[in-house]
Amino acid sequence: MKVIFLQDVKGQGKKGEVKDLSEGYVRNFLLPKKLVKEATDSNVKTLDAQKRSEDKRKEQEKLDAQELGKKLEELTVKVTGKAGEGGRLFGAISSKQVAQALEDQYKIKVDKRKLEMDAIRALGVTQIKVKLHNEVTVTLKVHVVEE
């Protein structure tokens, strides 16, 4: 019996997959637990439409990330911190502070977890990586100045 998986089933298939399974297993176990549905023509067409819309949504997310990445590469974020002799900071500049400064200065919201950086401990310009999407990583300049 052909079925469409509604959820991942260990050892059988992944969500959205169409597979031929034994009728008893499907009727007695998978259907009552709503893990699968029968692969009728209308259900298969619905699944294809869902896959197409999901692909379109993912492509749009990637394009949005690339557009934001172009903006970020041109910017320099200015962050202030207290410093001692030799340009060493008291404490450090964290990803949270950089994300907040980016939002305050340029009205661009970026999640602090997308900033791939170690804590900044010195004055000057530092380049950090920003992972906006699985396939889109850009470099952002952070200029740390003394208060």
Swiss-Prot record:
Region entry Disordered, spans: 44-63
Superkingdom of origin organism: Bacteria
UniProt xrefs under HAMAP family: Ribosomal_bL9
UniProt cross-references to Gene3D superfamilies, sorted A to Z: Ribosomal protein L9, C-terminal domain, Ribosomal protein L9, N-terminal domain
Keywords: Ribonucleoprotein, Ribosomal protein, RNA-binding, rRNA-binding
GO molecular function, one term: structural constituent of ribosome
InterPro entries from the UniProt entry: Ribosomal_bL9, Ribosomal_bL9/RNase_H1_N, Ribosomal_bL9_bac/chp, Ribosomal_bL9_C, Ribosomal_bL9_C_sf, Ribosomal_bL9_N, Ribosomal_bL9_N_sf
Biased composition (Basic and acidic residues): 48-63
Record protein name field: Large ribosomal subunit protein bL9
GO cellular component: ribonucleoprotein complex; ribosome
A GO biological process held by the record: translation
Protein family per UniProt: Belongs to the bacterial ribosomal protein bL9 family.
Its job: Binds to the 23S rRNA.
NCBIfam families linked to this entry: L9
A Pfam cross-reference name: Ribosomal_L9_N
